[in-house]
Amino acid sequence: VKVTHRNVANLLLTEPGGLGIRPGDRVAHLLNVAFDMAAWEILGCLTHGGTLVIRGRDLTAAARTADVLIATPTVLSGIDPAACPRVRTVAVAGEPCPRPLADRWAARAAFHNCCGPTETTIVNTMSRHDPAAALLTIGRPTPNNTVYVLDADRRPLPIGAVGEMWAGGACVSAGYLDDPALNAERYAPDPFLGGEHRMFRTRDLGRWTADGQLEHLGRTDD
């Protein structure tokens, strides 16, 4: 996937994607470098003057001294929040987050439930979760990005209706390297933004809630 500097900068240099990282903050490096979310850890930390805490075999040892954690729910589930008193911000993505895990961490830190495939530059929606909320959503599009919930004919669906989520805006990557057939299948001109903008077919199912949040409801190819 051809991800551009512009794509990455749009996530890291705007909030909430910047995760409030400040000079001197410690960000735990928990993820495999082959995973796109590792770029969020590494580049997000260094861009804002933070200190990257390189892990050994013990993830908790790195998390214990960190202010910010970025992880998949599976990785995060192996870390006890009580063992990480410094942590003030947590972001998860890469797979659906169990509600109990979100509630447990949100009681101690700013907890962001996020969503987005590699083709939309790590994540393109984020939600700061409140344990008292009725739903655990994937939130709203991050700055300069859009999400369209469309029917099979690529027409927008009303609030509450389930459809396929297409991503638009600054997050949309430049396509697959040397794969025109797959590019034609997954990328399309964005009729809503117009011009040279393109949108990406995520194959994720979702719907808008009445208060403008996105609910993730699985995959079209499950």
Descriptions of predicted regions:
Residues 22-23, 27-29, 39, 83-86, ...:
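His-Asp-centered acyl/peptidyl-transfer active-site segments
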Residues 21, 31-35, 118, 169:
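Conserved AMP-binding
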Residues 58-59, 75-76, 97, 172:
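Alpha-helix capping/helix-boundary segments
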Residues 1-26, 35-67:
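Conserved AMP-binding/adenylation subdomain of ANL enzymes
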Residues 25-26, 50, 67, 95, ...:
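Surface-exposed loop/turn positions
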Residues 8, 110-113, 128-222:
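AMP-dependent adenylate-forming
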Residues 47-50, 70, 80-137, 146:
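Gly/Ser/Thr-rich phosphate-binding loop
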